[in-house]
């Protein structure tokens, strides 16, 4: 007997499916009509500019593969609905390759936020916001982009950023709702919120991802206790890494017998090497995490530690909660 999704779970699944549709369109794998987009949808992108209309948006995304193959993968996904309005966000890492010379390649990363509306034909994306912050490789493949990202960060004369987390994040567009009932989904969404906050420098959003007694190892800075010390150090650290993007997957989670805590392992994706030769997900490091469900019903991290070392889905590390190594 299969479990049918109902209510918020059904909406969340439908919104996550829209992420897959966008990634397929960006990879050039969606040649048909852009039925996942509202006909009057809008795009704001620091790569593609401002566009209106479903077909123009799909064409602009597909054009990134005009000189060869464009492959876009996603991680750090979040989706929620409030009435007939939905929001979603995800990280995208893409690879552009030249058809005639596979050695000419460009790897890039982006943060994407979607707004969607419930229609008689299902959920449709009404707005796409794409903010790319880094790229590596042959810049010739990105000559059609308006503002190819660089590691230099903001410079005098730069246009305003496309994405301002305090205004445009899913949690700014909608109030944080009740976490999913499924523990894996709930902790996965918590990590997506945390990573969005730290990578965008949204300190208020980051504060809400930690308990007041957060502790652990924060490589390369060291071990800290308490939200004051942790947030202060992370804010200062983040200033020097404007292109930071914590691509990651939740790979293991277990509920604590007390019903209020959960242990989790999150694998850090390295976009340059996301798969094994056999096609299995590959990770370059992992986080040992402990989360607590607090009185407001929200999960927050209360302990964390970062561990270097490669592993795949057949060799996921064991739990080692409470032992800080940073």
Could you say what each language-model-derived stretch is?
Residues 2-9, 65-182, 239-243, 254-326:
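A beta-strand edge to alpha-helix "cap/lid" segment located at domain peripheries
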């Amino acid at each position: 007997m299969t479990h049918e999704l109902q209510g918020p779970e059904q909406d969340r699944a439908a919104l996550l499916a829209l992420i897959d549709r966008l990634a397929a369109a960006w990879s050039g794998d969606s040649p048909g009509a852009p039925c996942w987009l509202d006909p009057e949808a809008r795009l704001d992108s620091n790569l593609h500019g401002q566009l209106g209309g479903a077909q123009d948006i799909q064409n602009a995304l597909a054009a990134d593969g005009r000189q060869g193959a464009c492959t876009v993968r996603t991680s750090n996904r979040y989706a929620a609905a409030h009435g007939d309005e939905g929001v979603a966000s995800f990280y995208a890492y893409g690879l552009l390759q030249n058809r005639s010379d596979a050695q000419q390649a460009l790897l890039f990363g982006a943060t994407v936020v979607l707004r969607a509306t419930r229609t008689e034909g299902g959920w449709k994306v009404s707005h796409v916001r794409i903010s790319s912050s880094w790229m590596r490789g042959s810049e010739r493949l990105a000559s059609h982009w308006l503002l190819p990202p660089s590691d230099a960060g903001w410079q005098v004369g730069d246009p305003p950023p496309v994405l301002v987390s305090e205004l445009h994040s899913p949690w700014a567009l909608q109030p944080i709702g009740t976490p999913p009932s499924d523990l894996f989904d709930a902790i996965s969404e918590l990590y997506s919120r945390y990573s969005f906050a730290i990578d965008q420098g949204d300190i208020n959003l980051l504060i809400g991802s930690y308990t007041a007694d957060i502790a652990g190892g924060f490589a390369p800075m060291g071990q800290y206790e308490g939200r004051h010390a942790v947030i202060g150090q992370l804010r200062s650290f983040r200033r020097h890494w404007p292109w930071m993007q914590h691509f990651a997957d939740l790979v293991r989670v277990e509920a604590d017998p007390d019903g209020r805590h959960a242990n989790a392992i999150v694998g850090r994706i390295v976009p340059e090497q996301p798969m094994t030769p056999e096609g299995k997900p590959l990770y370059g490091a992992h986080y040992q995490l402990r989360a607590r469900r607090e009185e407001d019903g929200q999960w927050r991290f209360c302990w964390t530690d970062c561990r270097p070392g490669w592993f795949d889905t057949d060799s996921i590390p064991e739990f080692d909660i409470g032992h800080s190594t940073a």
